[in-house]
Amino acid sequence: MLSITPEIIKEIVQGEYHDVFAVLGPHAQKNGYVIRAFFPAAKTLQVKSKLDGSVLAEAVMRNEEGFFEANCNCSEKPSYYFTVGYGDKEFDVEDMYRFGSTIPEGDLYLFGEGTYEQAYRLFGAHPTEVDGVPGCRFTVWAPNAKTVAVVGDFNFWQGRAHVMRKHIPSGIWELFIPYLGEGALYKYEIRNHSGDCLPHKADPYGFAAQKPPEQASVVSVLDRYEWNDAEWFAKANNWTQRDRPISIYEVHLGSWKRVVEEDNRYLSYKELAADLIPYVKSMGFTHIQLMPISEFPFDGSWGYQPVGLYAPTSRFGSPEDFKYFVDCCHQNDLAVLIDWVPGHFPTDSHGLGLFDGTPLYEHADSRQGFHPDWNTYIYNYGRHEVKSFLMANALFWLEQYHIDGLRVDAVASMLYLDYSRKDGEWLPNSYGGRENLEAIDFLRLVNERVYKRFPHAMMVAEESTAWPGVSSPTSCGGLGFGYKWNMGWMNDSLQYISKEPIHRQYHHHDMTFSLHYAFSENFVLPLSHDEVVHGKRSLLGRMPGDAWQQFANLRAYYAFMWTHPGKKLLFMGGEFAQGMEWNHDTSLSWHQLEIDYHSGIQTLVKSLNRLYTDVPALYKEDCMSSGFEWVEADDRHNSIFAFLRKAKDEKPVLVVANFTPVAREGYRVGVNQPGYYRELLNTDSELFGGSNLGNEGGVHSEEIAWHQRPQSVSINIPALAAVVFQLDS
């Protein structure tokens, strides 16, 4: 048996002893059991029987800081509690050091292998019951720490009273604290291998957090919410497949709408459920995509520098409030996607960086572990425990919060070791290449596990390079995502539409080039938040000309986007052509809807969504070359584009767009089939703020061969407008 020396006692009362369970709690000895305890500032301690409350032993103080030792003459381990005296006050308390470990060995193995899909069931703070005693179990990974303690509002943020048990092979620490429950604030006090105390750390697996700028984790119950979306998941496959319409409304919850009268405060999750969801549904979008929801300290990061990956931000309410928001989305037939950030994490002292005094979650070498552009750490994807942490987090959002998919941020920065680095600032892989092999394996693993457990899910990559097979199955050598953002289309088309119409003829290729690769991946066409910040101006602000031309340009551009192959994504404010750049600190400019031009754009987006979801030819073969056919791709002089959208067993749709301020009357377009071509949408309609030049509802084909087709139609194309036709039955 361990000999308890004054030096060991001194280390315990200072919170520096590495193996407190070897000292504190009950220990068998020759004549019964010795029970040791440490209660800072306590004056007396009695060991009492749980059976009848009788005194089993009067403890002797061995250190005036509050270290006690009691001898119980009993043949079996006693069932006991403590009565602790602090002068004129006494308290009955459980001995937290009498409880054994509750961690299954199998869980430790899976975590160490990097394949633990439910790591959050092991780690973090879990209200539970052990041996009939309610309390909270804390578990954290810190293999190189000398000691780890739980600190919080329950112990005046002093760690020496709640030092944890270390599982030496795995580096995992745990402690069950009796009668500590939901709502308690806590962090981890970690001493590095030299015994130096680090800044208090938030729980990497914390399920709730204080509202910033406060930084503590909050004990939270995971599984209490009663969901009401079973009907939604029964039809889940209806909205994730490539042959379904997907129109995504991207939202920053903190600035969609604010309560100006109440100090410009945020809307809560429940208020957003009442206001945002009906609005998005009325606009005809099928999905809501939330910018990062995981807790983050700095508002200006928009959530892309998260500290609490497992905690929905408390800015808008509790975790259960967020579940309510998702639940309401599903009850209104809206899928929910969230931005997920596994590419990097911030350097905040309470975060993951140098977590146990060593580079634990990040690479030790800054050439691999530090991102110079964002001043953030980069995850060490080759470390199994880090893979378990991140993979389990992806699954956590889908399982615990019923999220329908993840948009993975900054994938390119993960794939390339030399991303945004000069020669000499990066390390090649084992083959001498620039590919981050460990990150590639990690992304494939996550996608495989997500789609295996949640076949209905939607995994989307924000990947800005020409990396092949991003949305191809891993079995075919791909990364395994379901979709990829089409950054090339976005950049080229915005570059084109921002030019004066007279110059567009020289940049015609910007609008046609995307069709050379449109079917190489499963694409989403993104007009995201990144395009309306940092001096880029709003989408409306990019349009050339006077006010009328700006709005007409934007209307035509939206119609081109909604009829172009690929799923759709539009950032909030774009649906009514907000005039100013997006500002995360203020509400959208909703007052602009009082202006007809702005309300006309809103009506157009609503009509485009309705058209898109009602006409299968516009979406069923979005990701197949058979779903698109150029009719006129070379009329650069007039800046006119004409194409067909097609699908098996569906009537084709003819789209003609004019990107000059000159109306083209009697413009002839070749068609394959004779008949009446009904005008489904005209962006120049007065409903949308246009001049109302059109085709009186449709046109009849004529037996005049044109564009290598046996038939043709003569149509009026308004200035800076797009018209959409479909062959009538």
Swiss-Prot record:
Monomer. It comes from Saccharophagus degradans (strain 2-40 / ATCC 43961 / DSM 17024). Pathway: Glycan biosynthesis; glycogen biosynthesis. It catalyses: Transfers a segment of a (1->4)-alpha-D-glucan chain to a primary hydroxy group in a similar glucan chain. This is 1,4-alpha-glucan branching enzyme GlgB. The keyword Protease does not apply. The gene is glgB. One of its GO terms (cellular component) is cytosol. Keywords: Carbohydrate metabolism, Glycogen biosynthesis, Glycogen metabolism, Glycosyltransferase, Transferase. The active site is at residues 409, 462. Its EC number is 2.4.1.18. GO terms for biological process: glycogen biosynthetic process.
